[in-house]
Each structure stands twice: as structure tokens, then as C-alpha cells.
Amino acid sequence: MYDFEPKMNALVPMVIEQTNRGERGYDIYSRLLKERIIFLIGGVNDAVASLICSQLLFLESENPSKDIALYINSPGGYVSAGLAIYDTMQYIRPQVSTVCMGQAASMGSLLLAAGAPGKRFSLPNSRIMIHQPSGGAQGQASDIEIQAQEILKLRSRLNDIYVKHTGQSLDTIEAXMERDKFMSPEEAKAFGLIDEVVEKRPGSIGDGAA
């Protein structure tokens, strides 16, 4: 289910389960997927988005009414890839609970905030960061202008998404997004990016429970 680099494959533990037909082995991430747990680890790109979206859709087909848990430890990445994950989270019928562990920066913070209301969590030593999208432009002046306009449109769209999920005003979001804004979990809760800071997991957090 997961496509890791060769060096990373050696570091992914295998889980052996006994069945009526003998032993069956899973990599740890595929085993956790059976419990409706998905991991977003590392940068957000098209390959990662394809994996996350396909798992969300698969779990919806398995049970459209049972929650899905998305654990996030990401520095962010490509806006288009992040929005593909975001749209899929909103599109499917199960509610998606989000949990930040380590960091949720840039698009990672947007996906953290996009979890189901009341089901957005952070571990106590995580860091959360929001900022405006960036991009490089090259080519003719007219091409640079077109790319700059597209970045401005993306910034406006991202601001609207943060407004929707945090409850902050557009002016507040625009001001906070102007530069990198790092937050502790407590600050992220006050800002509306998450609902709770958790040290121990209650049964309803991160186990795919409805």
C-alpha cells in the first residue's frame, strides 16, 4: 500500500498475524490501514496525495459511516497535491479525525485544520506553522505575470479554507499568513486549527472509532 525508497523499506516493520490459513505478513502501515489509520509522513507531493486519496476512498468503500484517523507529520509541500487530499477528505462520507505528531507546517497545517469538527488533535510537543504559498517564476514577462496571478489566486483560496475551518476573520488569517507563523499546540488550539491537545489517547482518538 505504501511506496517507500529502498532504504526506507528496510526500516518498515512487518507484522505477522495468525489466521485460519496460516501466517500472514503485513507492513506496519498496511496493518494500521485495517484499523482505519492513515499516515501523512514527509512532504506533500503528487505521489503522496495519490496514496492518501486512494486510502481514503478505499476506507469509505469498506465502511462509509466509520471514522478515519489521519496522523500528520509533514513540513508541507505542493499546494495542488495538498488540495487534492483536502478535497477528498471533504468529499468522502466518513468523518476524518486528524492528529498532529511532530509537525504540521504549510499544507500539513491546512490538512490538520480540515479534520472533522471536534476531532482535530495535536500531541503536546508538536509544532504547527501556517504561511502563504510561495513559488518561483521564470520565462517571459507575460509568463511571470500569469504565474504571479495564479499564486495570488491560490493564496486567496487557502485563506478562505483557513477561515472556514478556524472561525477566524479573513483579516486575521491574511495577517497571520503574511510570514511563517509557528505555533505551539496550545496556540494552535486558540487559533482554531485544532480542537484539543492530547497526551494520552482516549478510545475515540486515532483508532478509527465512530
Swiss-Prot record:
The record places the active site at: 106, 131
Any Gene Ontology biological process:
protein quality control for misfolded or incompletely synthesized proteins
Its recorded reaction(s) are:
Hydrolysis of proteins to small peptides in the presence of ATP and magnesium. alpha-casein is the usual test substrate. In the absence of ATP, only oligopeptides shorter than five residues are hydrolyzed (such as succinyl-Leu-Tyr-|-NHMec, and Leu-Tyr-Leu-|-Tyr-Trp, in which cleavage of the -Tyr-|-Leu- and -Tyr-|-Trp bonds also occurs)
> Please, which domain of life does this record's source organism belong to?
Bacteria
- Annotated InterPro entries: ClpP (IPR001907), ClpP/crotonase-like_dom_sf (IPR029045), ClpP/TepA (IPR023562), ClpP_His_AS (IPR033135), ClpP_Ser_AS (IPR018215)
Pfam families per UniProt? CLP_protease
CDD domains per the UniProt record, alphabetical: S14_ClpP_2 (cd07017)
Q: Does the keyword Hydrolase apply?
A: yes
Which terms are listed as keywords in the entry? Answer: Cytoplasm, Hydrolase, Protease, Serine protease
- The keyword Cell membrane is annotated on this UniProt entry: no
What assembly does the database describe for this protein?
A: Fourteen ClpP subunits assemble into 2 heptameric rings which stack back to back to give a disk-like structure with a central cavity, resembling the structure of eukaryotic proteasomes.
Q: What does this protein do?
A: Cleaves peptides in various proteins in a process that requires ATP hydrolysis. Has a chymotrypsin-like activity. Plays a major role in the degradation of misfolded proteins.
Family, per the entry?
Belongs to the peptidase S14 family.
Q: State the protein's name.
A: ATP-dependent Clp protease proteolytic subunit
* Native organism: Azospirillum brasilense
Gene name, per UniProt, is clpP
